Structure formats: C-alpha cells, structure tokens
Amino acid sequence: MGKQFASIEPYHREFIERQRIFFNASACAEGRVNLSPRDVASLRVVGPNAVFYLDLTGSGNETAAHLLADGRLTLMCCAFEGPPMILRLYGKGRVIAWRSQEYDRLLAEHFGAKETPGARQMIWLDVDGVQTSCGMNVPLFDYSGERDQLIRWAEKQGEAGLEEYRSKKNRQSIDGFPTPFAEEFAP
C-alpha cells in the first residue's frame, strides 16, 4: 500500500496544503523521541526537496536541540477529512535563527514579511524521501477552528518577555541537549 518517492510531487504539495495540521518527529541517538503537532498555515513547500515552517515559542525546544545534535527530521500529514492518506517527508533538518538574514528573507518571500507573534525560529527540512500510505485507519474529524491562546500569550509577553521565557525554557531539551538559544542566553 505504501509508495516511496524521491521528491515532493505536485499532488503531494496539494495534499499538504489542504491539511489543517502536521506533525514533526525528531530524535538524537540517545534520549527521548519528540513528536509535536503544528499548524499547516506555518508550513511552506519551497521546492521538490525543501520545506520549512515558522516555529513559535513553546514550553520546550526539542526539535531544535535534536537538529543540532543529529539532524534527522520527519514531517507527517494525515487526511482527517476526505479520502484517506498519510504522507511523510523524511530528511535532514536545520534551524534558521530568528531575525537572521535567511529568516528575514524567507519571512518576506513566503509570509509577506508578516511575523506571527511568538515566532522564535524556522525549521528547514531538506527532503530526501517522501512516503505515502493508505491512511484507512486514521479517524475522521470535523475541523472547528484555530486556537489563539498562544498568539494572545505571546502578544501579552512582548519581545522582552518572550526573550526572558526562551532564556529559561528553550535553552536545552528535556534530555539536556543544547538548542541554538544555549549560546544566545549563556549565563
């Protein structure tokens, strides 16, 4: 039932863009495996072998730590409505630092230079494999809307509050692996 591809085909891109949520999975050789849900509105397919997403401030920063240590990253979309399908993007990921030249360029090119409140970095994936599978066991869900709590929280924090939060909560993974913020907020 599963099929493998060397790159993202046009119909894969269309499938990704129709979804409401995607999941990212990362790990190091040691420690826990991380799996996180993300809003597809933050994800951009920029070529047959490249995607990235705008990553918002959260209670942890596992993906960034894992990418620094190992680089492996998998993104997955599932059809929760319409015809069943699961699509996985495999490859090597990297962190694009907040407010770096590359970050600013990608923000301008793919988000109209409009930054979501709480944005902390971008996660880039060089795709070296695509897999689709049937998804016939994935349940159907009715979409009822986006949550706005994180954006409202970030707006309330302001830049200084977000920086303080990241310095406390986003410097290392739960297994103690450093993130890009470890150097930025070094004591």
Region spans (language model):
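Binding-site signature for planar aromatic cofactors or substrates
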Residues: 1-187
